[in-house]
Amino acid sequence: MSCLFNSLSYFLNYSSNQIRQIICDYLEQNKPLIDGLPTDFILSLDDSNYIKNMRRSSEWGGAIEIQAACNLWNLRIIVHNISGRRRSKIEFLPISNNYVYTIQLTWTGNHYEPLKASEA
């Protein structure tokens, strides 16, 4: 299992595997991740079998899947990077810029953990 999908399932009403498959379906339909760049182009930069591989429970999710989750569920996701000495946070917003819920996760450099959620 992937810690990202497990962390998202903590806040969403879906199992981690359901979230993974919903996100992969979204990517497979070539729906936009970010404004101005086709999703198939973004995925081709990584691996031509990206979605097929991501459907496997052993694959780790990352920024692409976080952005897809934002778009699917109108979420703002804040990832607190707590790896290393320099702490930072990365904010992901849905392509519509309208979100109803904020989810916060921590990233340790190789692991996501759920932190908290709140209304927009």
For each of these PLM feature ranges, what is it?
Residues 55-120:
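Deubiquitinase catalytic domains
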Residues 19-26, 37-46, 83-89:
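Short amphipathic alpha-helical segments embedded in low-complexity Lys/Glu-rich regions
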Residues 29-56, 71-75, 79:
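Acidic, glycine-rich loop-and-strand cores that form catalytic or ligand-binding grooves
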Residues 1, 47-48, 93:
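A generic structural signal for ordered alpha-helices
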Residues 14, 45, 61-64:
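Short coil/turn linker and secondary-structure boundary residues
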Residues 1-38, 73:
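Active-site nucleophile-adjacent alpha helix/oxyanion-hole segment immediately C-terminal to the catalytic cysteine
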